[in-house]
Every structure is written in C-alpha cells, then in structure tokens.
Amino acid sequence: MIVLEDAEPFDEVRRDFAVEAVELGIPFHITLLFPFTPREQLTAGLLAELRAFFAARRGFEFELARVAEWPGVVYAVPEPDTALRDCMQALFLRFPQWPPYGGVHPEVIPHATLGEEVDAPSVRAEIERRLAGHLPRRYKVDAGTLLEEFARREWRVRERFPFAG
C-alpha cells in the first residue's frame, strides 16, 4: 500500500464513514495489492523480494483530486494515476498467486477509501462538503508499505520499502 501521511481532514472523515478500517488500525492509503500472503507465510525471502521490487522503482507524485463513489464506497481519486497503476500492475505480475481483491474485480482502480458500507450518494455529498477547500491535496510517494494483521482484527505496519528515488 501507499500510506498517505498528513491525512487530516481525511482521517476525520474516515472516523465517521470508514469506521471499521480506522478501528482495525488501517491508515489512510491507496492499496497496491490485497490480499497478500498471510503473516505466518511471510518469509525473509519474500520480504527481500518486496524490498528489491520497491528499490527498483522511482518515486512519484499525484493529487487526491476529487471525491467519487461506487455502490457502498466513497473514495478520493488520485490524479494522475499512471504511476500507481504501473506499480499495481507490476506487483500483480510479480505475485500472480495473489490476484488483486481475490480476482473479484476485472479492473482495479487506484483509490483512497473515505467511506465504506455506506449509502454512497448521500455520504459522498457530505464528504464533499467536509473536504471543500482540502482538495486537491498533493502527495509525494517515496515508499510502499506492507501492513499485516498481527492479531485478530488488528493491523500494523510490518515494513516500509523505500523507492530508489
């Protein structure tokens, strides 16, 4: 994942509309590949592969430009998303045993979830109101992050993988 630092007021919105993710300790982010290997199957070799993968990539920038929705989900749209899509696709190709979102979605679209399991149209309007004046927000990406479920319903950062530069 790409952890999005300096996340206020996004975290305030998430506390109201993405309650479960916040309670689980999942930071504001853009998913690169999920699900990934279970914690008990995460080996030193696999971590080394991830380090090498991210170390071979260059950092990039994007803006969270606007708010959009899917049924039940409200999210911030990163633009441009080409570097994110390239990184996601390269991870998918490198680790085909873990298809993105279990292979449920034919196309994986980069996004930063702001609300889930919600009435998307009404929640989107409320989130847009609350984020007025805060979008677009520019982000510089210099690392990928591996999050792991270390206890039932508790997540934490396992490792941060710096990009080449």
Regions found by a protein language model. Name each.
Residues 64:
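Portal/gating segments that form or line small-molecule/metal binding sites
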